[in-house]
Amino acid sequence: MSETGTTTTTSTIPGLVAGTYAVDAAHSEIGFTVRHLMTKVRGTFQEFSGEIVVKDSIEESTTNVSVELASVHTRSDQRDGHLRSGDFFDAENSPKMTFTSIAIKPEGDDYVLAGELTIKNVTKSIELAVEFLGVDQNAYGQTIIGFEAGASISRKDWGIDFNVPLEGGKLLIGDKVDIHLDVQAALQA
């Protein structure tokens, strides 16, 4: 979409118009994967909201996302309750996880979205690899955009360090968490 050293504009992406896009939670997913023993546990958050402000120059665009940590869902009520506790998210005292972008830059046909991720009142910088999926119209005639994004983080960086030691020096839960997003957002009038 952009050559090195040039600016990506909405005019270089067919159908994309500058404006504010609201994340459509019914057609989007925010999820994570973490190692548990020899397998991986996958989870999602059921309640979230977000806004993407697309500027004429893509590099000036911004995004903000807010996630209700109590809405974590891993297909196990017992595990979900533990994740909401002070051992992990402490959702009662720190109910939201937020992401605020600080920069977006093209990388080949994709993008890198840099921003500040806050969990349990700890804010750290992360970079998300973003694949822009395109522009279309939904059933209501609204302009919609779609993308997939992902990053890997160390949960310990946010003070989420609960674990159970196992024989041989192993731990029950991995430190690395893969975050993945599938997002559809609609242009607001």
Describe each PLM feature range.
Residues M1-A189:
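Low-complexity, acidic/polar, glycine-enriched regions of mature
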